[in-house]
Design a protein with these regions (language model features):
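Glycine-enriched loop-and-adjacent helix/strand subsegments that border the catalytic/binding cleft
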Residues: 1-138, 176, 207-214
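Active-site pocket scaffolds in enzymes
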Residues: 130-137, 145-207, 216-222
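Structured DNA-binding interfaces in DNA transaction proteins
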Residues: 141
Length: 222
């Protein structure tokens, strides 16, 4: 039953870091949520699709996700991204009042996914249905609270056209997966990198290693 995953995948995501604690028992409406977000990072939510599919019923993904998440090395302040705000998709049906925002709710962050230096996809966060503010509002609506420094991710970002997929599962329909030694790079930026203005969000890299090599690096036992 146990063994190496044969369907290792990536998920291109955008994460946000909480800057101001929301105490337990309090909630934040989406229209006010930006005041509690410090900034954004790039996220690779590594996924073992064979394990994930086994776990979906009855409880959903767990071990297929828990083994690794990679995050870009710096947090870009939300204030630096104001000029790249966008409206986002029309939300139908209309969200509940606590999720409603009047101003542009999305961010147009351009993203590229590369494996071993070869770019596989170019995509944007502008099409995300739910914004960071709406995520934070829903996270706190039951009074759960969040702490400064908490990180939350968007889920896989993918576009509607070929070449805008945010995972290998979507791009290759299950015909290609990662192998030991593969290096994945997710790069993010806002604006036009050739004509400007533009802003870099950096990149997040990760190389697949075998279980045996990882145990050796960490100094553990098989």
């Amino acid at each position: 039953m146990f063994g190496p995953s044969a369907r290792l995948d990536v998920e291109v995501e955008l994460g946000f870091v909480v800057g101001t604690t929301v105490p337990r028992g309090r909630s934040v409406a989406a229209r006010d949520a930006d005041r509690y977000v410090f900034g954004v990072v790039l996220v690779n939510d590594w996924s073992a699709r064979d394990i994930q599919s086994f776990e979906y019923r009855p409880l959903g993904p767990f071990l297929g996700k828990s083994f690794a998440t990679s995050v870009s090395p710096w947090v870009v302040p939300l204030a630096a991204l104001e000029r790249w705000r966008v409206d986002g998709p029309v939300q139908d049906p209309k969200p509940a009042d606590y999720l409603h925002v009047d101003e542009p709710r999305g961010l147009d962050v351009r993203l590229s996914l590369a494996v071993n230096g070869s770019v596989l996809s170019n995509l944007s966060s502008a099409g995300l249905y739910w914004s960071m503010a709406q995520q934070l509002a829903h996270l706190t609506v039951n009074g759960a609270g969040v702490r400064a420094g908490d990180l939350f991710a968007s889920g896989t970002i993918s576009g509607p056209e070929p070449g805008t997929e945010g995972s290998l599962m979507e791009k290759y329909a299950g015909q290609r997966w990662l192998a030991d030694g593969d290096t994945v790079t997710i790069t993010g930026w806002c604006g036009d990198r050739e004509r400007g203005p533009w802003l870099s969000l950096g990149h997040v890299d990760g190389t697949v290693v075998s279980h045996g090599a990882l145990v050796s690096q960490e100094g553990g036992a098989e």
